[in-house]
Regions:
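Active-site HxH/HxHxD metal-binding segment of metal-dependent hydrolases
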Residues: 40-43, 47-132
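Beta-strand-turn-beta hairpins that frame and shape the catalytic cleft
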Residues: 7-9, 25-30, 130-137, 154-156
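Residues that act as N-cap/strand-start positions at coil-to-secondary-structure junctions
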Residues: 6-8, 17, 119-121, 125-126, ...
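Zn-dependent metallo-beta-lactamase
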Residues: 1-30, 37-51, 79
Length: 170
């Protein structure tokens, strides 16, 4: 688990419970597509980056579910990276209490305030075409969550977040 898999020249992913995309910007800098489900995932991702001599410039979140943004806070504190999320996903990521509140229909009870529904806060900015590095484009994928997106790299690799599920998951 947390094995680095190279898919194309500049496109990788980390094999983990939620696949974490890596897009290599140059020989020493990368950006992530999502960050995993919690601080422990963030630590494991950081080890992979360090082992390859890569510095993290940005995280591009596909959507605001906790299993995709849970490593944000740890990685941002460790690296100072920027984090971007699309549309209303940015608000949910900046204010993670919104996800269990949305599911509950009001202020969530304690039983709904756990790491699987509520990630730690991170400082997130709105994702726009202007903040993307060269070679990365947004694919709009609303459905699973409000403003979910995927990304296509210049290697023609796509990161589709929760648009695809395994037979076992279904």
């Amino acid at each position: 688990m947390y094995e680095l898999i190279q898919v194309a020249e500049n496109s990788y992913y980390i094999q983990s419970p939620v696949k974490i995309g890596i897009f290599k910007l140059n020989e020493t800098e990368v950006c992530l597509i999502d960050s995993g489900n919690d601080k422990d995932a963030g630590k494991k991702v950081k080890k992979v980056l360090d082992a390859n001599g890569w510095s993290l410039k940005a995280i591009y979140n596909t959507h605001s579910n906790a299993d995709h943004i849970g490593g944000n806070q740890y990685l941002q504190k460790q690296t100072g990276c920027k984090i971007y999320s699309p549309g209303i996903e940015c608000d949910f990521t900046n204010h993670p209490i919104l996800e269990p509140a949305y599911l509950y229909g009001g202020y969530p009870p304690k039983d709904l305030k756990h790491k699987f529904l509520m990630a730690q806060e991170s400082k997130v900015e709105y994702l726009t075409e202007n903040v993307l590095p060269e070679g990365l484009e947004i694919i709009n994928l609303p459905g699973h969550f409000f403003d979910m997106v995927g990304f296509r790299t210049k290697d023609d690799v796509v990161y589709l977040a929760d648009c695809l599920s395994s037979k076992e998951t279904l």
